[in-house]
From Swiss-Prot:
Name the record gives this protein: 4-hydroxy-3-methylbut-2-en-1-yl diphosphate synthase (flavodoxin)
Keyword list, A-Z: 4Fe-4S, Iron, Iron-sulfur, Isoprene biosynthesis, Metal-binding, Oxidoreductase
Cofactor(s) needed: [4Fe-4S] cluster
HAMAP family, sorted: IspG (MF_00159)
Record-listed E.C. numbers: 1.17.7.3
Gene symbol of the encoding locus: ispG
GO annotation, biological process: isopentenyl diphosphate biosynthetic process, methylerythritol 4-phosphate pathway; terpenoid biosynthetic process
Binding site for [4Fe-4S] cluster: C298, C301, C344, E351
């Protein structure tokens, strides 16, 4: 069994969630509702939480938004959701925190962007106010630097110094270094202002995969703060999913990254929760965490001209996700369940035996029966028009038997061990 070594960091407590070092990598998401609409925002946070988001960031950009944060927190508490809220501040955060102190108290973490707090002495004062407010309220802070909103005075200073050097670097390399310096210098200022090191998380987001990997490798080697991973804008659909997976998987495999967000551009009509599902699947397929039972299914070939196995695989995946809101509480450990839905005799029986539960559907020209395997043993053979219903009933019974109060697999941990450096 492989062991992934995690980067050793300070551990940051955000309400009931611990971030950093050997703590599990945390999935974060962000609402796209108008925060001033407290009802709609609370409902979307509930939806994101139900999907598996462990922290949710909300925009706090106006007096109307700031005035509703405490109400959003109350609505969530009334619904039984303790999901930590992260306030996303840009440009006017210090004013909003001053005018609406209940906003700062209701949030669990502040996100501050050094690039748009302000310039010169005035900017320093605004940054200091936000940091002191966080410290007074015992809140964590993510100092989040972005490629597109980098502190221009810092960038110019570093560009000028680079031009004056005997061996100037390419401008893009200087910009990457400026991102890192901005984050580290801001963290140093925050500590001097009274914010403990174990209240600080850093991020340096860019939009290109290779740039993100390079920046985070360097940032991770130069500090002991937990790091939040994500592309600034991943894009839409498969492009966004592939880009996020490519970047984050490399860093996570190297032990870099303590919280993640998949910044997908939602396609028209697609649920906001997609970014949460993608984040879960990245962590689960890497063996870092388990969130929901996984379905193994073959890609199909000339032996599987029927779509029956594809439809069953989709039905099973949807069924498992829908049931998890109930199963998670009733059947601890069920998230590690592995189900195989295979399309023909070539790999079907073998993959089905390796899964906790598997079904091998008949391929083209094969006998129209579907053997079901449970814990490696052939259990029953299904046939007829009700294969899907009967197979889901077998899955349901397996979960109740094995993950119930006296189940042999209750609380069984199949996650690859994580060790801190």
């Amino acid at each position: 069994m492989n062991t992934l070594q995690r980067r050793k960091t300070h551990q940051v407590r955000i309400d009931h969630i611990t971030v950093g070092s050997e703590a599990p990598v945390v999935i974060q998401s962000m609402t796209n509702t108008d925060t001033a609409d407290a009802k709609a925002t609370a409902l979307q946070i509930k939806e994101l939480s139900d999907a598996g988001s462990e922290m949710v960031r909300i925009t706090v950009n106006s007096p109307e938004a700031a005035s509703k944060v405490a109400e959003i927190r109350r609505r969530l508490d009334d619904m039984g959701y303790a999901t930590p809220l992260i306030g996303d501040f840009h440009f006017n955060g210090e004013r909003l925190l001053a005018e609406f102190p209940e906003c700062g108290k209701a949030l669990s973490k502040y996100r501050i962007n050094p690039g748009n707090v302000g310039k010169g002495v005035k900017g320093d004062e605004k940054f200091a106010f936000m940091i002191r407010t966080a410290a007074e309220n015992d809140k964590a802070v993510r100092i989040g630097v972005n490629w597109g909103s980098l502190d221009q005075s810092l960038a110019k200073r570093m560009m000028d110094a680079n031009l004056a050097s005997s061996a100037p670097k390419p401008p893009e390399e200087v910009t990457k270094e400026a991102l890192i310096v901005s984050a580290l210098e801001s963290a140093e200022k925050a500590v001097l202002l009274g914010l403990p090191e174990d209240k600080i998380i850093l991020s340096c987001k860019v939009s290109a995969v290779q740039d993100l990997i390079q920046v985070y490798r360097e940032l991770g080697s130069r500090c002991a703060y937990p790091l939040h991973l994500g592309l600034t804008e991943a894009g839409m659909g498969s492009k966004g999913i592939v880009a996020s997976t490519a970047a984050l998987s490399v860093l996570l495999q190297e032990g870099i990254g303590d919280t993640i967000r998949i910044s997908l551009t939602p396609e028209p009509g697609s649920p906001r929760t997609q970014e949460v599902v993608v984040g879960q699947e990245i962590l689960q397929t890497m063996g870092l965490r388990s969130f929901t039972p996984m379905v193994t299914a073959c890609p199909g070939c000339g032996r599987t001209t029927s779509t029956v196995f594809q439809e069953l695989a989709q039905d099973v995946q949807n069924y498992l996700r829908q049931k998890m809101s109930i199963w998670r509480t009733l059947y601890p450990g069920v998230e590690s369940l592995n189900v195989a839905v295979m399309g023909c005799v070539v790999n079907g029986p073998g993959e089905s035996k390796l899964a906790d539960i598997g079904i091998s559907l008949p391929g083209t020209g094969e006998t129209p029966v579907a053997p079901v395997y449970v814990d490696g043993e052939r259990k029953v053979t299904l046939k007829g028009d009700n294969i899907a219903t009967e197979f889901l009933a077998i899955v349901e019974e397996y979960v109740k038997t094995n993950y119930g109060e006296n189940g042999s697999k209750r609380n069984q941990n199949k996650i690859i061990p994580i060790q801190s450096l």
